[in-house]
Amino acid sequence: KNKKRLIPTFVMLNFCVVTSHEEINASEITFLKDHLKAERVDVLGCCGVQFQVHPDNITEELKLERSKKIDINFITEDERSVHLLASDMDGTILEEECIDEIADLVGKGSEVRSITAQAMKEGLNFDESLQKRLALLKGAELEVLEHCLSKKINVRPGAVTLFRTFKKHFGKTASLSGGFTYFSDHIQKELEADFSFANVLEYKEGRLTGKATGTIVNAERKLELMK
């Protein structure tokens, strides 16, 4: 029963890193060690364990677990030398899309989602889509953002463990978001991420102007930042 909640997030040529949203106990570690025929076990934290293992030792039982939404991936030893973990924020680190939550609170949820759907269907570029959606939020009070952050936004289970473990053992971490710094600055602190980039909402006299200031963090900008 317990082993079903374990989530192997990625398997390398000579290593298998297992993470869970709950504490991994000694019996679960022993189960995985035996079935992987692991030569070495390194406990990365209460919710993470690394096994030195050969891919041939992935058993049929663990392959069966893969069909139950467990993600098992192989990469070469050369590819293992990863030094940067970069992730989107909205809908990735966070369970929600911040702009949708803000829009819901000001009665513009369906309109904002309609623009998003149109952009995906008709190829409207991100900058145009963002400008149209932000225009619908014009006049919203900053208290709406505060309420959204404290009551509506949830960090996805495992995200904090992933970021902190990667930072401790591998390299730098970054959040690259097409969302907003109002939220990403708070999330960066919780993740203990090294870097965080997002769009800056413009406001005057405590209300949103319906615009963003500075360079828009779109797909091209994210690529530039990673370089």
Regions from the language model: what does each represent?
Residues 29, 61, 99, 184, ...:
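Generic structural marker for isolated residues within well-ordered, non-membrane alpha-helices
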Residues 109, 140-144:
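A short secondary-structure junction motif
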Residues 124-136, 140:
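Long, charged amphipathic helices and adjacent flexible linkers at domain junctions
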Residues 144-227:
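C-terminal cap/substrate-recognition subdomain and adjoining C-terminal extension
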